[in-house]
């Protein structure tokens, strides 16, 4: 048996790591199922603090500046699951406060993605719908000495923030109200003035060093046109919208961790209700970029076919690749809600998908990199295959003459004189083989099922 073991080991060691992985998954996928992850996916998410049945309101707030991907799916699934867990409500809110980035096609793509995931919001709205209300809260914050108008250039602002120093605009309280009227009435243009939060320039949390709350963007907005040029940043719009929308539990990715202090302070100054803020980690895959920043160059440089390329983790790409919404949901829930940065393999998502589609899928034979085998002395034969090994999905017939194709990986193990069985067909013995040209000749031997010869898939 040792010569055989040695032969197998030599073949395996000659393969690249990726080829070994493909071979392992293709032949022994069931044995590799992540049992613990599957069990965990069937349990509920951990309970929320200060949550009452029937009163929980969550929100999914994507910016319509790109196509939705698996990271958006994670956030959407989690907030919907919590809304369902507490018999509450889910708001889909487009945080569309940057006219330079927002496009109608992205609103539509996000809606299509949410629909495909079988997520049904109780309310759909745009932050831009409340732009004048946000202006009124901006004025109120200035009146309460919680913000001021800054006319410094960007370089000065950056330098002073890094040094923890205040600019003259913050100190010039006499002109704050006058400048406030000017900025809300359209007196200033792009880069001439911004509204900044009056925080703590000495804070170790740099997010509290007078961040920008409003800036001027002189560009047409896809929803409201050119009516407005003074637009709130996410730092200002998010807490206001969450509070007035009745959101009880606001889920934010870990990247906003330092900005949660600002979130709460803005609401406290304005005497608005403060939602519970829950942080969770973003979703990234091992060896697969997820963020738009990393995917965009691949699309622009035409390294992929577009945003729906099945190699990408966009929802359009995952759909084209054959993933089901339920597999994505189970995968997300298996990860749970945690701050720890993990990069699961996409093979885990694939395993969830296999489990779901197993009972729905016909079994077909497939060979990657075909190797041609011409068979001598074999009578034409009609082979009948079951479309599923255990379920009634019918049959298919294949008429075989004297040519079949096997996988190049299987062909690498063959040599002259070796007998193999073509699954559900018959046995053949190799009489000639050229591995470089990917072709060979074999003799038909018999139809007997033998235990000691390898069984190979063919088409």
PLM regions: where:
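A conserved active-site cap/scaffold subdomain adjacent to cofactor or substrate pockets
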Residues: 255, 304, 317-343
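Extended, non-catalytic structural segments that build the interaction scaffolds
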Residues: 299-307, 311-318
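Active-site cores that bind ATP or allylic diphosphates and position pyrophosphate for catalysis
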Residues: 144-295, 303, 352-353, 358-362, ...
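Short amphipathic alpha-helical coiled-coil/interface segments
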Residues: 2-9, 349-357
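NTP-dependent nucleotidyl-transfer catalytic core
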Residues: 1-236, 274-282
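Hydrophobic, mid-to-C-terminal alpha-helical segments
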Residues: 265, 297, 330-356
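Glycine- and acidic
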Residues: 58-65, 91-97, 243-251, 309-315, ...
